[in-house]
């Protein structure tokens, strides 16, 4: 096996620690070519599509990429921000917000981000962190609920990069934080602040809050993936924090791909049914997405909105994701601090948690 080229080893006074946020990824630009390149990498991951690769690659290259590339590019163009892809923009803001938070609490750590698909890649950022003197890296996926198709494949990519290194850094991973009190608090605060600015649904009159999580094939649940259970756990804790019951709140799953059965109930049909049943207002919040992206802005904010209004609903609200909200940045800092314990982060003072 050939290892990546590295400079000669020498005693380093840095001994630095890094916190690496890892998210899914995004095309570099909203063009058919860039989107096809991104989708080819994403949909070629056997963790994402569990079909024999010889068969799947023929379907992917001859049918899916030619058809979806242009259509998906139009959707990305509809949500693209002046600074770039929403997912990248909000992830960068999370990083830039975490840096002063750590510094203010005496933590001397490098904070950066990487994408599982597209750029910046996990391998490239790990190499960059090594060059910056990082000898210990905390991998912090931006997936609160564990799934093999998100968390595990991010770890796969990180460990594959480590496998090519002669001089490996020490690595820790955060598996999930679906029930972490700080995460639940951040979710509840996001909803409360939105309602404070836009009005609270009239739950006594039948208005609904829908908690929409990204779907996965139902088969993965049957094969032992804990994702569904953790989504339900998050939803139950959030409902409790908001003082809501299953009468006021529904849990659904979105972004179904292909014809196989996925986790149900599906988000879009549920909103259409609510509109047809006379529900006047529906608010949709996506607790499993830590940053707004195509699936939240376009799929929920445009497609699902139309389903609800065309079904008979009168008022639709998409509550923004956590993004770089104060409560979420504080939660990220707390989650990271708990997992940095025992590492030489050179704390000037010794706070119990990053706040």
UniProtKB/Swiss-Prot annotation:
It catalyses: heme b + 2 H(+) = protoporphyrin IX + Fe(2+). InterPro entries: Ferrochelatase, Ferrochelatase_AS, Ferrochelatase_C, Ferrochelatase_N. It comes from the Bacteria. Fe cation binds at residues 214, 295. Keywords: Cytoplasm, Heme biosynthesis, Iron, Lyase, Metal-binding, Porphyrin biosynthesis. One of its GO terms (molecular function) is ferrochelatase activity. PROSITE patterns: FERROCHELATASE. Pathway: Porphyrin-containing compound metabolism; protoheme biosynthesis; protoheme from protoporphyrin-IX: step 1/1. GO terms for biological process: heme biosynthetic process. Catalyzes the ferrous insertion into protoporphyrin IX. This is Ferrochelatase.
